[in-house]
């Protein structure tokens, strides 16, 4: 089945919308749409994760270091390291959680 990835989830005012595309023993693939001003506060995860920005611009903080990502950019979130996500403007991202 062919599809346009960024069309799989829509923005909602003052919300973060997510849709799980795959959820397997080896990992998961989730698409997110962050409305402007939304954020995920600092947290950790037990697995490595790969983020790709598929629309807009995002601010990802890993262990206190801020990274500004544009559409098409990717970043790896190491397991057990504190990270946060901030939407100064609307953006969409793919999150690949890689379980070991």
What are these regions (language model features)?
Residues 64-79:
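Short acidic-glycine-tyrosine-enriched beta hairpin
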Residues 15, 30-45:
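Conserved short histidine dyad/triad with adjacent acidic residue
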Residues 1-26, 61:
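A short, N-terminal "cap"/entry segment at the start of jelly-roll beta-barrel domains
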Residues 28, 57-59, 66, 82, ...:
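Structural motif
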Residues 47-59:
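Glycine- and acidic-residue-biased ligand/ion/polar-headgroup-sensing regions
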Residues 54-55, 70, 89:
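A cytosolic small-molecule/anion-sensing beta-strand core signal
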